[in-house]
Amino acid sequence: MEKIKGYKGFDQNLKCQGFQYEAGKKYEHEGKVDCCNSGFHFCENPMDVFYYYAPSTSRYCEVEGSGDIDRDRDDSKVACSELKIGREIGLNGIIEAGVNFILGKADWANAKE
């Protein structure tokens, strides 16, 4: 089973779309998984989380998605049937994860000058 590491934003109460989450818990969605419509959602690119949750009013966690998977065509948003909420990383953590994500994509051996 494919497991995808990612990041999820929440409101101040650790809710998303009215669903209450808790760090360290795993959740399962019954039914069809369709990105932007149904299933549990998260982003692979930490910076994409800011499209959905503003930095000044949100909380952020590392997550792992698995089960049925559907991907968005516009950004790194993923929908899944199983979502494990990892540790809360806060704003500094999501920014650091974003920098590391970008640096991980750089191909320094073939850098253009």
Question: PLM features: what roles do these ranges have?
Answer:
Residues 1-113:
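Short, glycine-biased loop/turn motifs at secondary-structure junctions and
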